[in-house]
Amino acid sequence: SKLEDGSRNFFFKVNGVRIFCKGGNWVPTDSLYLRTPKESYETLVREGAAAHFTMFRMWGGGTYEPDCFYEYCSEYGILLMHDFMYACAFYPDHKNDFLFEAEREAEYQTKRLAHYPCMAIWTGNNEIAESYTDWFPAPIKPERFYGEKIFNYIQPRAVHRNSPLVPYMPSSPYFGDRANESEQGDVHAWSFFGRHPKTKFKFVYELEAFDRIPARFSSEYGFFGAPVSYTHLRAHETEADL
């Protein structure tokens, strides 16, 4: 919905009631995800509900989860903002064999997940629209948006055909002239919260910075997490070196 200053709201309504979305991004539970037992999925979803989460964002650099995950999210009342599994890259939509596989994937997953109450929205990918508008200077910017046929045609048609009550947007973040704008749509707030101005990839850890994010809907942000102490100890001789 458009506001008086020209910006736009971004929010979810359930049964006509506007809700507050609190949650986090869901990434694969294990680097070998097939070894994650069903009980672990329930534990993780239950812990999210206990923390008053109302939504997980299914990160497009991960994987589609097994049926039990969607069953637990529906049972515990956690909605899903669900990326299709494409992330941070351009995809060869000029190749018919690739488009065929993309269409099969979209058809299968939208049919498989259509009946789960937890499905709040499908999003086409993780950060690919933003990458095209923001990540590449003119000399190396691709001549066109590779993947457009997938995100603007194949996926939305599959969603509308197989799950017509679930909305679709082509990417996350999305909306606005540059995809990741704080005045419109959802935002991935990585560059705002304290990146050191003179060192491109050095982060300044300021918790207070999260209070200053001017986003309509922050669908991804956070801090880099440290590994467990055992991992550190494998790389250091003694605990005193930590």
Report residues per predicted region:
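Active-site-adjacent substrate/metal-binding segments within catalytic domains
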Residues: S1-A89, L99-I121
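Short helix/loop capping segments that flank catalytic or ligand/cofactor-binding pockets
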Residues: C21-K22, A226-V228
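Solvent-exposed loop/turn segments at secondary-structure junctions
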Residues: G62-T63, Y86-C88, N126-E130, F175-G176, ...
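Active-site neighborhood of glycoside hydrolase catalytic domains
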Residues: L99-E105, R112-D177
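Substrate-binding cleft/loops of secretory-pathway carbohydrate-active enzymes
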Residues: P173-D211, A226
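Short acidic/histidine-rich active-site segments
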Residues: S218-G222
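Conserved small/polar residues in nucleotide/adenosyl-binding loops
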Residues: T231, A235-T238
